[in-house]
Amino acid sequence: MKIKYQHGKFIFPEQISSSAANISCGQVGDATNQQPPTGSGVSVTCAEIQVSYPDLKNVEFYRHGWNSWSPTSWWSVTKPPYRVWNNPPRSLTAEDAYSDDPKVHQSYLLTAIKVDPEKDLIMLIGSLGGESGYFEIGEHLLTARKLPDKTDNSAHPVPSKCDKDSYVSWWVGTGTELSVFQAYAAALRKSLGSKDKRLNRYPGTIWSSWYSWFEEISEETIEAEIIPAGRSGYQVLEIDDGWEKGIGDWQPNAKFPSGLEALANKIKNNAMTPGIWVSPFIAAGNSTIVQEHPEYFIHDFSGNLEPAGYNWGDYYYGLDCTHPGAKTWLKEILTTIYEWGFRYFKLDFLNAAAIVGRRYRTVSREYAYQEGLKTIREALPDAYLMASGALIGPSLGLVDGMRVGPDTAPYWDNTERKQDPSGPAVRNAALNSLSRYWLKPLVALDPDVAFTRSRGSLLSPEVNELTQNLARVCGNFSCSDPYTWLTDSEKNQVREICTEFGMPPSVKQISRFKFRSGNEVVDFAPWLYPTERISDRILAK
């Protein structure tokens, strides 16, 4: 299907212009100059959409990343592609390594092009039903098609124009930026059907161990936080990475001699929900499960285990969520943790289940990923699932909350990773999270933790406040500041914020980076894209 923007007008196929609800590949009629109403859109089903815009120069487009950490922002076709540059191990984690191309502007799930900046007019194309559409954006041509995949020893053949296996349900809309993103979100929510029932759960305020103790946690460090966290007003206390014997060996290590059930009981006795970090879709090569059951993991097409990412000083492997034995193992480990008393699960590195490779069943990689999430939900029917490293589209309706940006950090930016917009930093986390604000009607947004502390941090008080405002805008407040690290003033601030977040704050988006939160107007643009010197207010690592 072809769409053209020329001489200030969209030229749509006839069926779209007459507001047909659905059209199928091979049924597109002649073009017409009629325009769909501003802020509206229609759904179409076809293998490919091409949008040409021969008159436009220096096109600004919306680049949406595949998973939680993937770079997401408005960008220009005149710049190098917005992606993780020249770091293959990092790309395995923060990009779709299979489709990633250093020479091509790409987007996943949706994209938009700004066709008239003076009138705030954009065109948006997005996939529906929880599937990640794939987009390539050039100076004068945008192409949308199914996500590239490979399920056997040869690449998928190029689909014919009416090969139904290559069909994607798309939404196409035009109008002002905010109105079109809102309309697409509404259409996407409707397309999720019965999965929509999991929306709008609120976890409450969260204390997490990660951004202070990282992997150096122990039974003593967690115990020391329980009573102060409860008194401060936190509603969830989450034990992050560092409790397990190893990645894939999900049992408490020697630093937790009493086990985790005792800690979960202490958390509950202090009126909080016990939370835990686990990465159920990955395992290290030396883990018991990989050693005993390598068949549970995704292989390359030569029969070797396929690396799914790099962390903890080595490569790790992705679970084959179509394998019956892998599903049984997945349910067993999660049921065990649930029986310890945990009801809030931070599920990390989920994208590993969607890498290209050979699986037990020949299905698309996103289908296999969703099979894994459904298995998790079967094991944890009433738990709150916060998905990190998650595929955005395929996770919608299957999880409660989702990380929508890279890791934050106790510093503004990392100058050593300037060419990695997925690298840990407050700026990267804020830019990604705000660029995905349109997802808020679909899933609880996790922008990562806010900061109040001055100890162990390079952040100024102004940037601490910015992280707190980011939490307000996204509707979720989490924090990793240890109680003993805080001044009396900072302790009071935590209590006030926890009280404020008894229910999510009321927020209205005014423009791309400007919001009204309660009675306050917050504009993030001067921080993200400063027009004056701000180095006296920030510190970069």
Task: For the regions a language model picked out, list residue spans one by one.
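Residue-level signal for short, function-critical loop segments
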Residues: 211-213, 280, 478
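An acidic-aromatic substrate-binding cleft motif
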Residues: 187-236, 240-245
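Aromatic- and carboxylate-enriched substrate-binding clefts and catalytic-loop regions
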Residues: 233-449
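N-terminal accessory beta-strand-rich subdomains and adjacent acidic, glycine-rich linkers
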Residues: 1-187
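Alpha-helical scaffolding within the catalytic cores
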Residues: 184-194, 224-225, 258-260, 292, ...
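Active-site-proximal substrate-binding groove within the catalytic cores of carbohydrate-active enzymes
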Residues: 161-165, 362-541
